[in-house]
Amino acid sequence: MTKLTYKKASIAVAVLLISSSFTNAVHAADEHNVVPGLTAVGKPLGLHGIDPVAFINIGNRISGSASFTETYDNVAYYFSSEDNKNAFKKNPSKYVPQNGGFCTFGVSVGKKFDGNPKFAAVKNGKLYVFLNEDIFKLFQKDQDGTIMKASQQWQKIEHVAALSL
C-alpha cells in the first residue's frame, strides 16, 4: 500500500468511526427523550440530569452529577452518588423512565413530547414523566388508562422520529 493510499484509508476509517458515534446519538434521540448535545461520555443526557435511582427509591428529584455517569441504551444518566450509579448498573430497566422518557400522556395519543421530571409519577415502581403540570393533572384523572394506552402506542411509535408523528 502506498503512503497516499494508506493515508486515504486511515482517513476513511476515522470518518466511519466518528460518524458511527453520531449515528448512535441520533438513534438514541429518536427513541429516548434526551437533552440536546452530548455528555462527556459522548452520549446524550436522559431525564434532564435527574438521578433516576433517587427518584424511584426515595421519590426525590435530585440532580445527578457528571462524576457519576452510567450509559444505558445509548443514553447517559447522571447519579447523585456512586451507590445510586451501581444500583442502576445492576438493573437499569428498573430505573429508566418509561416510554423512552417522553411524556406518557403524549405517547398515549401517539406523540413524543418532552418528559419533564418536574412533572412525574412513580406508579407500580415505574417512572412516568409528563410535559407540564396541566398534562400531569390529566394523567392523574385516569392513571391506569393512560399508562395502558401509552404502552400500546409506544410499541407503534418507539422507532419513529418525534418530528414524524
Predicted feature locations:
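Generic marker of residues within folded, mature protein domains
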Residues: 2-3, 18, 60, 110
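Bacterial N-terminal signal peptides that target proteins for export
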Residues: 2-12
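C-terminal segment of classical bacterial N-terminal signal peptides
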Residues: 18-26
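Charged, low-complexity intrinsically disordered segments
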Residues: 26-78, 82-165
